[in-house]
Amino acid sequence: MENTENSVDSKSIKNSEPKIIHGSKSVDSGISLDNSYKMDYPEMGLCIIINNKNFHKSTGMASRSGTDVDAANLRETFMNLKYEVRNKNDLTREEIVELMRNVSKEDHSKRSSFVCVLLSHGEEGIIFGTNGPVDLKKITSFFRGDCCRSLTGKPKLFIIQACRGTELDCGIETDSGVDDDMACHKIPVEADFLYAYSTAPGYYSWRNSRDGSWFIQSLCAMLKQYAHKLEFMHILTRVNRKVATEFESSSFDATFHAKKQIPCIVSMLTKELYFYQ
C-alpha cells in the first residue's frame, strides 16, 4: 500500500500519517440584483495560484509534498468557473510582491472579480516566499480600492493555505449529533475583500502528501458541487464543516495524533457572491 504523509504548513514539524473520518441566474431565480455582485462582465476574472513547494536551504523549511495536488485541483476548479488561471511556482518573497504589484496594475474593468490563492508555509499574518517571509498585508494592499481602481466594488478573494501558528487542536466530543447600485459614491478602501484561511489564528494547517491539504481538498469539492447552486459564504460554511468533521491527523507521535482543524473566513464583502447569474 502506498504510504502518504500528513504535514503542516509551518516552518517545520514532524511528519504524521493521514486519517480521513467517514462518517445562470436572474431575478426570477431569487437572487437580488441589488444585494449581489454583478458577475456578468465579459470575463469572470483572474485566478492567480502561487504554489511554493521548495524552499531555500537557508530558511530551514521543508519541502511541501502534496501541494502540487492542491495547485492542480484549484486550477481545474477555477477554470471550470471560467476564470483565467495563472499558476506560479516557487516564487521568492520579492517575486511574490512584484507579481502582485503587476497584476494590480492590469486593467480589470472587463472582469467580474479577482482570486488569489497562496499555497506555502506561513505564520500569523505571514506567507513564505522560497527565501523568506512576506506580510500578507503587503500582498493584499495592492488591491485596495484606492490602489486598484478597476477592481473597486468587485469581490477580491484571497485563499490562503498556510499555518498561522503552532497550536494544535485536540477537538472535543459532541453529543449534538454529526449530522441597488450604491447610493454613496465613496466606499471603504478595504471593502469587498474576503480572506479564506485554511485554519484559525495561531494554529497549524494540515496537508496530505498524496491528496493535498484538507482545506483545499474540501474547498474544491464544495465549489464543484455547489458553485452553481449556492452563495459563496454558504459554500464556505460547508467547507468549514467538511474540514471539521471529516479529517483528523494520525501519527505515531502522540503530540500530533488525533488533531483537528477548522478554516477561518474573514469577509469584508458588501454583497452576496454567486458564481453564476
Swiss-Prot record:
Q: Which residues form the propeptide?
A: 1-9, 10-28
Subcellular location per the Swiss-Prot or TrEMBL entry: Cytoplasm
Matching InterPro entries:
Caspase-like_dom_sf, Caspase_cys_AS, Caspase_his_AS, Pept_C14, Pept_C14_caspase, Pept_C14_p10, Pept_C14_p20, Pept_C14A
Q: Name one GO molecular function term.
A: endopeptidase activity
UniProt modified residues of type S-nitrosocysteine: C163
N6-acetyllysine, modified sites: K11
Annotated positions of the Phosphoserine modification? S26
Biased composition regions of type Basic and acidic residues, renumbered to the chain: 11-20
| The protein's Enzyme Commission number | 3.4.22.56
Which residues fall in a compositionally biased region of kind Polar residues? 1-10
Record entry for activity regulation: Inhibited by BIRC6; following inhibition of BIRC6-caspase binding by DIABLO/SMAC, BIRC6 is subjected to caspase cleavage, leading to an increase in active caspases.
| Assembly and binders | Heterotetramer that consists of two anti-parallel arranged heterodimers, each one formed by a 17 kDa (p17) and a 12 kDa (p12) subunit. Interacts with BIRC6/bruce.
Q: What does this protein do?
A: Involved in the activation cascade of caspases responsible for apoptosis execution. At the onset of apoptosis, it proteolytically cleaves poly(ADP-ribose) polymerase PARP1 at a '216-Asp-|-Gly-217' bond. Cleaves and activates sterol regulatory element binding proteins (SREBPs) between the basic helix-loop-helix leucine zipper domain and the membrane attachment domain. Cleaves and activates caspase-6, -7 and -9 (CASP6, CASP7 and CASP9, respectively). Cleaves and inactivates interleukin-18 (IL18). Triggers cell adhesion in sympathetic neurons through RET cleavage.
Family, per the entry?
Belongs to the peptidase C14A family.
Q: What is this protein called?
A: Caspase-3
Which classification does the entry list for the species? Eukaryota, Metazoa, Chordata, Craniata, Vertebrata
